[in-house]
Amino acid sequence: LLSVCIIFAHDMITRCYLEITNVCNLNCLFCPKTTREKHTMTLDEFDTLTTRLAGEVRFLYFHLMGEPFLHPLLPEFIVMARRKGFTPIITTNGTLLAQRGDLLDALPHKLQISLHSHEGNGKDNPEQYIDEVMSFAKEAAQRGCIVVLRLWNEGGLNRMNDSILDMIADRQPRPWTQRYDGWKLTENLYVESDDMFEWPDLQH
């Protein structure tokens, strides 16, 4: 019921996308959605799959179609993944960060927060959303987690990008260090811009 997507590089597996849930709390316009039966991975399922992948995959991504922060066992999954030698990476829409302070004690190697999901749901006034995102992101970055605030909406719904960047600057003042894909705000904390993501055919 859930998906596993494996990425090869030079005949080696480098990345694996492990869908720990296909349930999401948003309805983003840019997301193709899934018609599969809703399912949330159990601890035994995660243990079995990661045992099979151990030693074969370096980067383990805990998402595909669902929102990983909805999973109550996410901290346990991260700890288990690290113990088995994976580098865990999570992408989230960021709406549940304020409710998941438990994740601050079980952070992944990298946390990618899709800020474009806010406007992608037709929402206005992102002040509270950005406040909650930045509060979690700054604390996570201070604890050694790489945090990437993503605005992957060039060519799509992006009229709020400038105001979102200004709100971020209110909480992490400029100047920022310019990068090829955005800015480095401070140690371990980045803003990344890109074109609107085009989903591959996942046979959903």
Name the predicted role of every residue range:
Residues L2-L111, N121-Q128:
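Conserved alpha-helical substructure of the radical SAM core
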Residues S3, I7-F8, M41, Y61, ...:
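Radical SAM enzyme [4Fe-4S]-AdoMet core and its adjacent flexible, acidic
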